[in-house]
Amino acid sequence: MRHSLTFFLFLTFFGTLIANVSEDVYVTGSVIKKTSLLVANPISTFDLNDIEKRGTLHIDNFLSNLPQINPSNSNFHSNKATGTSSVSLRGLGGTRTLILMNGKRLSPGTPMNGTAEQDLSQIPFSLIKQVDVLTGGKSTIYGSDAIGGVINFQLNRKFSGIDLSYQHSFYNHQNEDPNYERKNYDLAPNSVSDGHANTLQFSLGYEIFQDVYLTSYFNYRSVDEVTWSQRDISVCALSGNAECRASSTSPEGKFVENKVGGKTFHVKDNTFASGSTFYNFASKNHLLRPDKKNDVGILLTFENLEKHTFNVDYFKSSHKTVGQLDYSGVFRLSVDLPCNNPFLSNQQFTAICSDNGLTLSDTAPLYISRRNIEGNPRQQNFKHSTDRFVFDVDGEITNEWFYNLSFQSSRTTADFTYLNDISKQRAINALKVSGTPSKPSCVSGNDCKPWNIFLNSDGNLKSSAGLGVTKEALDYISTNLKVNAELTEDQYRFVTSKSFTTKNAVIPSLDMALGLEYRELNLKKNADDFSDGAGQQYPHSSLYGSLKVKELFSEIYLPLVTDTNLNFSIRYSDYSLEENSLTYDIGLVQLFEEKYTLKFSQQKAIRMPDINDLYSPTKVNQAFLNSDPCSGSNPSKSISECARTGVTESLYGNISNTETQINSLIGGNLNLRPETAITNSLSFLYSDEIDLEIDFYSISLKDKIGSSEVSFILDNCLETGASYYCNLIERNPTTGTFYEGS
């Protein structure tokens, strides 16, 4: 459960935050015609001019400057990049923020992870007419995912003329912070100008016949990379005291004996020295991902056709981006190294073999970590393409009953390639070598090439294996991993509404809307065996699944003569997984003269588990554990408490704790229930020469979908001994650690 209470203050000039709509229209957050001022949720409105003043080429960068929005995925993400751009309303996450375009749900973002998080890169920047940011639950109007709120991009359907624009931008940074200069690592350049971006936008619109409007557009954008090495704040990964964090997976390697109290070595010249060295793993990472994006689209509008309006739209968006990480390597790879490996010097043989009573015919069990600086940095290449078709018709049935019927279909594909990783199995094969330094051969035979990591490396490839790492060995152990995925969504929606007049003096009129909706998602994802990739922190796996929902909803609007306006809405959802939900929305808007408005609302909203939450297979995933209370020579927990987590008497007091990155298992669950959130909002608006909005809100989130923190599981097992937690814990049976082995 999550509870939060937050206070926001919005203060801007010239009415940019509060929409001044002079006519009744369909507004964000309602299916009944009224002004946005009468929507009980807090709502802020911006136009294209507001966005362009920021000078940004990314709509997510503009939105992230708003106080009610946090960034989710963006071009500034590399390590956990999805290749998409998204934002989070009220800090609840991108999967709990619903994105609309022209009042309709935007296509799902990426089939790579099968989540509902939508990609803002699909929005045609040049045609944005208005952006509405509505906070608070809106599942009654839009369905699942609208827990934090909705962001609606309204496009200019009646653009007239030709518009051609070009924009160039870049970053300039002075790396002169003295706090970083005192630290012991290489500094970034004194002054840099980078991240050059270019955008070309072309729009064409005209009235081809009377009341028939055609609008089309083409947008292109390219952005250059910025690496961490170009900034003083990121030239290495900084810890809390501004010192450089580092990885023990270094070019000198880390060789740990697989036994209780096993020694640790690294390569020094052609010998093993005690301990390990450290490597700056951050400098090659992307601080800003490079990308290329192009969009095309056509919007066709037919008006006044027997009291009907038809809209037919087609959108296509193509996006390429690369997320770069530092060199791969082998990370705590379990290897039974032959003691007769010809690359071992006499001193190295003595250290790991003869000192442990092993002979040339034996193997030394080791955990080996070693950075592959002879190769290239890891790169995650994303190629996304989205095709979206929308058909929409508005009209009058009879007796002032109005209706809206819409259908939309989208197809999003992803081609993903993970470059320059190392195959675990081939690395093991290449380390199991016999023969002589001049004529080494792999024990496994086949096309295996010996990998000599027992000499200091300068990063250059060698002509023969006896001198170090060769191109043949690098080619053999290197691997590229691929994913091809497709996510489709079809949605049908029908809404009918009518305004009733009454003879009641208090309630002179009543507006009512009824709606039906059907939505279906299908995911197909084919992935290589990512579990063999040594550098995979969040490995992909094949995934197939579908999700369907049938929904019925209603909204009632009561304008009272006392300038009090009441809103009620409700939605019933029936999901294909034998789950159903009922959501509601109650709102009150009180007007005081022309300057003051008071709003109150309470909503129950949901987020249904998405395809990834439901169907994802169980797989090894990277997790973080700051400390193990059962490690070290003097553990902070007793032996009886540690025994609950798998610590034996022989391991107690002999478990090392040198790593914070550990392995965990994570997967989907078909028994998941929908998340439910109760949101209460109170807003005060003042509008005169300036516009001022003050919002108070509280959110209670139950049945949150996600994985538990490993520290939470470990602490609860230690404290309670409950099998629910303790059965989730597995230590290395030999060393007792969480990070050695798989």
Predicted regions and their residues:
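Hydrophobic, lipid-facing positions within transmembrane beta-strands of outer-membrane proteins
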Residues: 85, 149, 160, 198-202, ...
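Transmembrane beta-strands of outer-membrane beta-barrel pores
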Residues: 137, 168-172, 220-224, 316-320, ...
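Transmembrane beta-strands of outer-membrane beta-barrel proteins
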Residues: 162-164, 210, 214-216, 308-312, ...
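Short loop/turn motifs that connect adjacent beta-strands in outer-membrane beta-barrel proteins
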Residues: 158-161, 208-211, 305-309, 396-403, ...
